[in-house]
Amino acid sequence: EMTSSLVGSEMCIRDSIEGGMPWTLRLKSPGDINKKCYFDDMIKGKIEMPENVIDVVLLKTDGIPTYHFAHAVDDHLMRTTHVTRGDEWIASVPLHLQLFKVLGFKPVKYAHIAPIMKEENGGKRKLSKRKDPEAAVSYYDEVGFPAESVNEYILTLLNSNFEDWRRANQNAPLSDFPFNLKKMSASGALFDFVKLT
């Protein structure tokens, strides 16, 4: 009985597609709602989240792959080993690791960076490329900041040990700085425009 209903469903699907009905391609998630996904983020450390159990769309009705599908396929084909991206993507890691596994791909290592924060009205908010001109690199060139100064300031935001290194290595080129993901802020550095000036 189960077999005949599946065959009937497949025939209905085939007829609908052949009839021109729009369709999407979804992942049939092998996830278990009672199991956890464990991974080691290169900045945030060990993270535990529920496994993905959602049958997510991989190809949209226009034939364009979703970010999730493109991430797994493109990074596999390009032999990407490490992915650095904003921490708003942490919630997607269980799905992404699941996609790598079901596709038979070696998973990448993730480093999720916290957004740069800005003080506003007594609180903090994420620096926004839509609302804040200082979020664009071109802004600093337009207002006359030397590139070297901007690079130095950005390194103070990215690595907590940069200022100590600079004091000890006043004449060293920035390329000598031993950048370390473990020294990045897990909660988001505060952008201080006054300090830059």
Which residues does each PLM region occupy?
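Active-site beta-loop-alpha junctions of metal-dependent nucleic acid enzymes
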Residues: 86-92
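A short, conserved beta-strand element enriched in hydrophobic/aromatic residues
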Residues: 67, 78-86
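Non-catalytic beta-strand/loop surface segments
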Residues: 13-19, 23-26, 32-69, 95, ...
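Short acidic (Asp/Glu) patches
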Residues: 9-10, 50-53, 134-135, 196
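Catalytic adenosine-cofactor/nucleotide-binding cores of aminoacyl-tRNA synthetases and other
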Residues: 102-197
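Residue-level structural signal for beta-strand termini and adjacent loop
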Residues: 71, 83-85, 130-133
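Single conserved hydrophobic/aromatic residue that forms the stacking wall/gate
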Residues: 1-8, 12-15
